[in-house]
């Protein structure tokens, strides 16, 4: 174990954040497959894919743990709560985009990065459409299960 833990570049005064877990090939492969880091995706498709995941998994807690979970409209209330949270998240993305990029007219050399106002707006739009669409898909899937229709 003494040979495994040693200072970075044999200098005890220089630190770094690489650990055996964070610098492993498996972790690097998992992170490179996330839509935020995947090569070749447009900002719209990044937002769409991230929104699809978020809208789908946000539906469950609102349906099963919401205040109207035992009523006849529990599923609809969960869906509307999910859409409400998606709107709030999209407003948060909008506020971040205005604060970070403002009204600047800089042109990026790479159209697929999220460091411009235009790319951030595309990402935000894709997120909203994907999240609302997947929440609607989850609503349709859950409404077709008889145990969710009648309690």
From Swiss-Prot:
The chain crosses the membrane at residues 48-68, 73-93, 125-145. GO terms for cellular component: chloroplast thylakoid membrane; photosystem I reaction center. InterPro entries: PSI_PsaL, PSI_PsaL_sf, PSI_suXI. It is a multi-pass membrane protein. Coiled coil: none annotated. Keywords: Chloroplast, Membrane, Photosynthesis, Photosystem I, Plastid, Thylakoid, Transmembrane, Transmembrane helix. GO terms for biological process: photosynthesis. It is found in: Plastid, Chloroplast thylakoid membrane. Belongs to the PsaL family. This is Photosystem I reaction center subunit XI.
């Amino acid at each position: 174990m003494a040979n495994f833990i040693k200072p970075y570049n044999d200098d005890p005064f220089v630190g770094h954040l690489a650990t055996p877990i964070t610098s492993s090939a498996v972790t690097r492969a998992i992170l490179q497959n996330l839509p935020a880091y995947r090569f070749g995706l447009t900002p719209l498709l990044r937002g769409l894919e991230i929104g699809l995941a978020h809208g789908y998994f946000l539906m469950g807690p609102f349906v099963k743990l919401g205040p109207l979970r035992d009523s006849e409209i529990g599923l609809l209330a969960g869906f509307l709560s999910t859409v409400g949270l998606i709107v709030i998240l999209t407003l948060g993305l909008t506020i971040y985009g205005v604060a970070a990029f403002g009204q600047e007219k800089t042109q990026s050399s790479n159209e697929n990065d999220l460091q411009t106002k235009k790319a951030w707006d595309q990402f935000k739009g894709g997120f909203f459409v994907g999240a609302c669409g997947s929440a609607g898909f989850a609503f349709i899937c859950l409404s077709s299960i008889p145990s969710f229709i009648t309690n």
